[in-house]
Amino acid sequence: MISSNDFRTGTTIELDGAVWRVIEFLHVKPGKGSAFVRTKLKAVVSGNVVEKTFRAGEMVPQALLEKSKLQHTYMDGDDFVFMDMTSYEETRLTAKQIGESRKYLKEGMEVNVVSWNEKPLEVELPNSVVLEIKETDPGVKGDTASGGTKPAILETGAQVMVPLFISIGEKIRVDTRNDSYLGRETQ
């Protein structure tokens, strides 16, 4: 159980048999009456967003989520198949469960799969990934002086803005949280 006073962005709670993540919260102390906490909750499974108000200090069941490190092995139709590298058990997640993470997910990548009651819910990507540029406009000598950017399509199909001097075939590091270019990867 967790007190509504202890809510923070990212806290997971159980309501009506579902897992909800707090995406916004505001402690309100009106001049008259008791204090309350106004929250915006997002359903982890469906992605629905609702606003809910809790009394200050109200105890709410906290959803205990388990994270396990799994490797993305292959695609089976629209399903993403992950394997536990110690027990070799396979776990399947649908494209809906993967959500926006699919644009950075490539075979062989290790990710955290979040489960609740032994049911996989979502995938947590690393903060940055290294991917190869598959398509972009060619760089012209002297482009670095202007400091501009151009769109580039990565090996997973994601589109990222990169500096003008980046060319096809180069490996770059991308921030998965805000889709930004972090730098060239030299290996």
Curated annotation (Swiss-Prot):
It comes from the Bacteria. Gene3D superfamilies: 2.30.30.30, Nucleic acid-binding proteins. GO terms for molecular function: translation elongation factor activity. Its main location: cytoplasm. CDD domains: S1_EF-P_repeat_1, S1_EF-P_repeat_2. Pathway: Protein biosynthesis; polypeptide chain elongation. One of its GO terms (biological process) is peptide biosynthetic process. It is found in: Cytoplasm. GO terms for cellular component: cytoplasm. Keywords: Cytoplasm, Elongation factor, Protein biosynthesis. InterPro entries: Elong-fact-P_C, NA-bd_OB-fold, Rib_uL2_dom2, Transl_elong_fac_P/YeiP, Transl_elong_KOW-like, Transl_elong_P/YeiP_cen, Transl_elong_P/YeiP_CS, Transl_elongation_fac_P. PROSITE patterns: EFP (PS01275). Belongs to the elongation factor P family. Involved in peptide bond synthesis. Stimulates efficient translation and peptide-bond synthesis on native or reconstituted 70S ribosomes in vitro. Probably functions indirectly by altering the affinity of the ribosome for aminoacyl-tRNA, thus increasing their reactivity as acceptors for peptidyl transferase. This is Elongation factor P. It comes from Prochlorococcus marinus (strain NATL2A).
